[in-house]
Regions:
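A compositional/biophysical signature of low hydrophobicity enriched in polar/charged and small residues
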Residues: 1-82
Length: 82
């Protein structure tokens, strides 16, 4: 569980259809649990940061946005050093 009380924190990398990255980023920001969604340059078109206990639901909502082609999710890990 993260410090804020959410079970999962993830980075979701989104590939969009041509010309859709700005719209996809704006729509992704509206999803509950999304901390930010920003267009990026590189292999992916949008990076989404989410803190949620319903990651599958967040990913499904992202996929429901018109213009989304694919996603790849990275679950953050917490390392504890003593």
């Amino acid at each position: 569980m993260t410090e804020e009380g959410y079970p999962l924190e993830a980075i979701i990398l989104v590939t969009t259809k041509l010309g859709e990255l700005w719209k996809v980023a704006e729509e992704a920001k509206k999803i509950e649990g999304v901390q930010f969604a920003k267009p990026v340059a590189g292999r992916f078109d949008v990076v989404v940061h989410a803190k949620t206990n319903r990651l599958s639901w967040v990913i499904a909502r992202i996929h429901s946005i018109k213009g989304v082609a694919n996603t790849e999710s990275l679950i953050t890990l917490e390392a504890k050093f003593e």
